[in-house]
Structure formats: C-alpha cells, structure tokens
UniProtKB/Swiss-Prot annotation:
The gene is atpG. It is found in: Cell membrane. This is ATP synthase gamma chain. GO terms for cellular component: plasma membrane; proton-transporting ATP synthase complex. GO terms for biological process: proton motive force-driven plasma membrane ATP synthesis. The keyword Transcription regulation does not apply. Its main location: membrane. It is a peripheral membrane protein. Produces ATP from ADP in the presence of a proton gradient across the membrane. The gamma chain is believed to be important in regulating ATPase activity and the flow of protons through the CF(0) complex. Belongs to the ATPase gamma chain family. Keywords: ATP synthesis, Cell membrane, CF(1), Hydrogen ion transport, Ion transport, Membrane, Transport. F-type ATPases have 2 components, CF(1) - the catalytic core - and CF(0) - the membrane proton channel. CF(1) has five subunits: alpha(3), beta(3), gamma(1), delta(1), epsilon(1). CF(0) has three main subunits: a, b and c. Pfam families: ATP-synt.
Length: 291
C-alpha cells in the first residue's frame, strides 16, 4: 500500500510540474498573440491603401493594352501554392487543418503533378518532403512577428515563378485568424492580379488618372508591391492564428492537467484512508489476540 501511495504522490507532483509549464506557455502565447494582432492592424492600414490604388488603376483605361505579365490571365497548365504552417508543434489542430485542405486540393485537381509548393514553416516542409511532393522553395524559422525583410526573398521567388510562367496561377493557403478561439482555412488567389480585383473594379465607376513618368513604369512598380503586400499580410494573419492556436492548446493542456491532479488526489486520499483503516484493523486484531 505504501508503494501505491508513493506512486500516486509522484504522479501528482509530476502532473503539477507539467501544469506549471503549460500555464507559462499559455501566457507566452497570449503575449505573442497581442503583438501579432497589433501588427496585423497596423499593416492593414497600408494594405487597404495600396489595394484601393491598385483597384482604381485597374478600373481605369490606363491598364488597357498593358503587357505586364501580372495582369495577364493565361491557360492554366500548372498552379503554385504558398502553404503557411508553423515551425513547431503544440498548436492544436493548426497545422493539420491547412495540410488536409492542401492535400485534398492536390488530390482532386493535380493528379498529374501539375503544381508547385512554396512552403513557409518547418511542419509543412517536412510533411510535403516526406511524401515526395513538389516543393520548389521553403522558408524555416519564421520569427514570431516576421518582418517583411525576412520573407521578401521567398515572396519574390514566388512572384518570379509566375512571371516566368513556371506556373500560371498563384494561391496562398493559410489559417485566417478570426478570434482567439477560431481560425478558418483560406485558399486565396494572389496572381494574376486582373482576376483578383476585377469584380471590385467592375462595381465602381471609372476613375481618371494622370501618371508620371509613364503608365508602364507605374504598373511595373505598383503591381509587385501590391502582390507582395497581399502575401505578407497572409503571413502575418497566419502567425496571429498560430499564436491563438498555441494559447488555446496550452490552456486546454493546463485544464486537463488540473483534472488529472484532482482525480489523482482523490485516488491518493482513498488509498491513504484504506491504508489507515487496514492499520487500525491490524492493531485491533493484535490486541484481541493478546487477550
């Protein structure tokens, strides 16, 4: 019985230590979430402005006849997917949701292997490589609040692959942050731009522009910036969802640990009571034997 009591007590102590660790990790994820949400709000100011300018430009007559490849829709022979996952685990179903969605799309639409994956996050990279899938580029070790400089190269590589007709459409696949408890899988088209904002442009009237130095130079500078802002915004959004998922997962782990501690404490008290009862019974039996 003494052995049983000591084993239960050891489990209680071990679970309490685990609970303290998961509680601390929840607090860290919570702090990261607050920073990411603020970063997303700050970036949205820039993103909305550049989107408005691009949409106004596309609904004007100034883009008619432009040969900028980012505006050109062409027959789709191959599709590019930027897939954003985390670099670590302990984020609940964050990674499994997006990976399942990507696998479903590839199974349904790309049985012939007519796709390229640009992977952001170690979990996704390892997942795709283990299955022998087409990973063109990858980025590991993304910061908790990634700067544009950190992701500039892989974004530029993705855009260049479209411009050079390695693939004919570009999508970004990620978890969109809704709130601290909820995220939604998003598969959002990035290129060609003409498809992306055509509906928005059609809803409003024509805007007049006078551009300096000339139309083509403006388009050549604006369109890459616009696309890069969309992809970077998706990365910030995905990171925010990741921190929220980590916070929720650690809160769940902490709650589960507390439930285990309560159950073990009840077991310990019952075992201790049984041990005391047995000792009393043995003492009484011994006293009766002496009479």
């Amino acid at each position: 019985m003494a052995g049983s009591l000591s084993e239960i007590k050891a489990k209680i102590i071990s679970t309490e230590k685990t609970s303290k660790i998961t509680s601390a990790m929840r607090m860290v994820s919570s702090a990261k979430l607050v920073k990411s949400e603020q970063a997303a709000r700050d970036f949205q100011i820039y993103a909305s402005k550049i989107r408005q300018i691009t949409t106004d430009l596309l609904k004007s007559e100034l883009t008619i006849g432009s040969d900028n490849p980012m505006l050109v829709s062409r027959p789709v022979k191959k599709t590019g997917y930027i897939v954003i996952t985390s670099d670590k685990g302990l984020v609940g179903g964050y990674n499994s949701k997006i990976l399942k969605s990507v696998m479903d799309m590839i199974t349904e639409y790309h049985a012939d292997g007519d796709y390229e994956i640009i992977s952001i996050g170690s979990v996704g990279s390892d997942f795709f490589k283990a299955r022998g899938m087409n990973v063109a580029f990858e980025l590991r070790g993304l910061a908790d609040q990634p700067s544009f400089e950190q992701v500039r190269q892989i974004i530029s590589q993705s855009v260049d692959m479209f411009v050079n007709e390695i693939f004919d459409e570009l999508y970004v696949c990620y978890n969109h942050h809704v709130n601290s408890l909820t995220s939604q899988v998003r598969v959002q088209q990035m290129l060609p731009i003409s498809d992306l904002v055509a509906d928005e442009a059609a809803e409003e009237g024509v805007t007049g522009f006078e551009l300096e130095p000339n139309r083509q130079d403006i388009l050549d500078q604006l369109l890459p910036q616009f696309t890069e802002s969309l992809i970077y915004g998706a990365i910030i959004d995905a990171k925010t969802a990741e921190h929220a998922a980590g916070m929720t997962a650690m809160q769940t782990a902490t709650d589960n640990a507390k439930n285990v501690i309560n159950d073990l404490t009840i077991q310990y008290n019952r075992a201790r009571q049984a041990a005391i009862t047995q000792e009393i019974t043995e003492i009484v039996a011994g006293a009766n034997a002496l009479e």
